[in-house]
Amino acid sequence: MHSARFLLAATLSIGFVSAQTCDRACLKTTLDQYLNAVVQHDPKSAPLFAGFRQTDNGVVVRPGTGTWQSITSLGKVQRSYFDPVSGQAAYLGLIEEGQATDVATLRLKIEDKKITEAEWVIAREGAIGPGGTNGGNLYNLAGFLAEPPLTRTVAANQRASRELLIAIANSYFDGLTTHDGSIIMAHPGCTRNENGTHTAGPNPNPDAAKGKAKGGGGDCTSNLTNFSVALISARRYPIVDVEQQVVLGMGIFLRKPGVKQLRNLLAEWFFVEDGRIRNIWASMFYPTNDLPVPNWPPYDANLPFPAEFAAPPASPAPAAVPGRGASK
């Protein structure tokens, strides 16, 4: 009798989990519904959970405000990635806010076919840079158009496991904080594109810089000695798209004590081939010192910039390497 009851309970439990699972097709449909609702400025047309929560660059906004009002259309580059295990979907590409075009990452969490979370990381032209002045951020629309993120389906026998993909992505953050590129699990010549600016590896479209810093020195493991980051806090890997071999890593770059640069909140996309990073794309912004970021659980690193990190330097800080120290 007890065995029969256990089997019945287990069967019902499996059925319940199956009913709640959102596969790739479900995630894609939900992501499309949300993006269409945002463009239409109509939260009611998206399947939002009653307790839905959204942040725009770390700031909580109510449905119908923030990006719900400002985004007028999606841009020419639109990429989508899905993680049925975590129940999350993401967008990497361009968005239009009136006459402005931005580089953006969007993360959605879906539970029981309802959107419970939305997180935007948006790079806008003319935004505040690491030095605290407007227009100091990396931004290159032409570079993003010329070097768009990949979309692909990797053969099953060539895919790294979910666990290995996360470890590969985390090795990049470990390499940055230890200032040792040999720790990073990456191919020689791995590339990096930040807010459309090519900052590491061979540049497939050097003319796209249009007079801006062309970057591309070394590769994604190079020039870390003077990288002005003491800690990458609040590391998260919400999207692990095993089918496309893509990982979304998110974190906060905290500067070395005495370095007068703002923190950096990043959405860093890792594209993996044969168990190593081949390409990186990132959208990012520089939060002011009083803004709690990333403003998502577990909230461990959601503090304003610590005073000891923001203190004026006793002596000039070492020169930062363009594209990493100066820009990130």
Please state what every model-predicted region is.
Residues A19-K328:
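C-terminal and inter-domain tail/linker signature
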Residues A10-S18:
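Hydrophobic h-region of N-terminal signal peptides that target proteins for export
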